[in-house]
């Protein structure tokens, strides 16, 4: 990978992109940290009996909190233009981001499959939906997330830049390694989970329409919200990843040429947008809660999730998928495995 940079001062466009990234990351931190903390508090303190869905939502909020706790380090990097936290901090921050991204997307997939099974095979779902099974699934999700994020530890390093400055940067032995990492992340962190989510909710929508559920119209709107929110935050990021992978396979170094420079600019904003996805869940909870927010006050999250323990049986009675869907939107968003240092000043200065 090319680790040299131009000595020219950053252009106005680059400064604007960096400022926009700082704004997005600051909003994510300001909204997501208290929002997800409130969700964790609501489930742990306000719910006496936690359903399987509540346990998944709890883990999702914890994953979002983990990635948001790394945001101050990246904000410092963007503001100062240098990485000040050493090699261990570099790898740890990016590894936490990777684990959070995978944990979030796998939790989303698990919740989607759970919903689909509850509608398609309610009796089977009722037998499988135990806290013991949920804990095993959650443990498996976290173990798999830690494993899938390990390439970050192999490729991230701290490289010198200018005088007395350094960058936390991905350094690959070859362009083939860069292509592999980007494609691997796009496939495992978006494509396969997204296909599972779409298939699950498409099946739910088809079955609800066939059974003429009273709340199917509302459920349909929520399903669309779930899928669009998921895609809006992650599709652009992974499209850029795949475009970069294509350039790597063609032997073109990152950030070089007109296309490479534009991809580097876009990547700054899209990585910050992916961080912002970790703050959107509490907002979706509030939107899905409807009247509960007004009637239950600070306890609305607990009220929202209280009915999910009997989703399977209530689904058979034909009236509860509104509750099921209400818990769904909160599941759709994870943290990015690439931090803002992935589109570092090293690349941005090459745009001049």
Swiss-Prot record:
Modifications the protein undergoes after translation, according to the UniProt entry: Phosphorylated by GRK6 upon leukotriene B4 binding; which promotes desensitization.
GO molecular function (one): leukotriene receptor activity
Positions glycosylated per UniProt: 2, 164
SUPFAM superfamilies: Family A G protein-coupled receptor-like (SSF81321)
Region feature Disordered, mapped onto this chain: 310-352
InterPro entries, alphabetized: Formyl_rcpt-rel, GPCR_Rhodpsn, GPCR_Rhodpsn_7TM, Leukotriene_B4_rcpt, Leukotriene_B4_typ-1_rcpt
Sequence ranges on the Extracellular membrane side: 1-19, 76-91, 160-178, 243-268
PANTHER family on file: CHEMOTACTIC RECEPTOR (PTHR24225), G-PROTEIN COUPLED RECEPTORS FAMILY 1 PROFILE DOMAIN-CONTAINING PROTEIN-RELATED (PTHR24225:SF72)
Family indicated by similarity: Belongs to the G-protein coupled receptor 1 family.
The name this protein goes by in its record: Leukotriene B4 receptor 1
Organism of this sequence: Homo sapiens (Human)
